[in-house]
Amino acid sequence: MKCQCSWLFACALFLRPGTGPFNASAQERELDIERYARLIPISLEGYTGEALSALRFDLEIQGFEITGADKAQYLLRGSNNGDVSGQLSDRVNKANLLSTKYTGGTSRSEAHALSDAVVERITGRKGIARTKIAFKVENGQNSELYVADYDGHSAIQVTQDHTISRDPAWVPGRRVLYYTSYKASNPDVYVHDLQSGTRRAFARYPGMNAGAAPSPDGRRVALVLSKNGSPDIYVCDADGSHLEQLTRTKEAESSPCWSPDGRTICYSSRELGRSALFLVSVDGTFKRRLRTDGAINCTEPDWSPDGKTIVFTANMGGFQICTVPAGGGSVTPLVAGEDPSWAPNSRAVIFTRNRVKGRGVVSLLDVPTKQTKDIQQTSGSCSQPCWAK
């Protein structure tokens, strides 16, 4: 797909995310929330069919509101006659912002590229419309793994093990997945290169091998092993060597995830009775409970790429997606559901919506505006989505 693009000088509003993982003050976080929670009104003119549908989906899940031209701050005019073109202007400030055309792809892929360009031009953030996801699909007693565009379209089945495959996790910046499969009649961890189609067993210790989570640089992997009794958190190199045990409790640990700097792992543990979130340094020098004031039975943490926030599942009479500052503190409930995973923009979350007639539905959430959208569903019960970073 080719892009012909010209950036036009204008005074535009840029909403720039912070960079420090732990140093944002409460006042700064409140300002971020207030700023990002405002829907950005934009009008779409000249688009039809699949291109229009994709543009609406992409923009609405990234903090925009599609309105009439008379109510919009931004106007996006263009067409999708064989290619997708767009001219973006700021109606309020009377400024031209962008003129671009995409060719050589499908109408949907070209629309995704245009929406990403619009999002970045207006907000200063990279768009997410051309990102990928992985998820589990259950049919009967078996489950297989799929990868798809972030909106669920163009889904491709990855595993064909005719057993239970689960817990997909992307290697950051690569088309490689770790996951757990019962292919050999035991929960073992495999690593699958999607580009070459090759896969190999990664962890096949006695007992449970699960929850593999590659580090941000892809050089190390955290995982849950029960080879010494109860399930504990371990880390090893990406080739499986230098295995180190980080936790030693009689209760079960699960769901490790990494801080963006690769120094800390957040995980769930029942060592205090109920499930709670803990932090442990990769070198094993410290461990502490993460405060989640206002939430109990906390599991399935995922650390935002900007380092500021941890999203997780709380079970308080029903599964609830919540966030908490990475240093701990008061919890913000977001939406009913489970299996949360951050988008690369640290703004959107993909999750499993509460099951409809026993069938899992994967949805997207724009955290600041609380806008949600179901992705295109694959036949079966879908769950455990993981967003490629």
Regions of interest found by a model, annotated:
Residues 10-18:
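Bacterial N-terminal signal peptides
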Residues 22-57:
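A structural "domain/chain start" motif
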Residues 24-38, 103-160:
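C-terminal/domain-edge helix-coil "capping" segments
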Residues 52, 56, 60-72:
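Interaction modules related to DNA damage response and DNA replication/repair
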Residues 56, 71-117:
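Amphipathic beta-strand/beta-sheet edge segments enriched in Tyr/Trp
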Residues 121, 163-180, 200, 204-224, ...:
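Conserved beta-propeller blade repeats
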Residues 141-156, 176, 180-201, 220, ...:
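Beta-propeller blade-edge and WD-like acidic-aromatic loop motif
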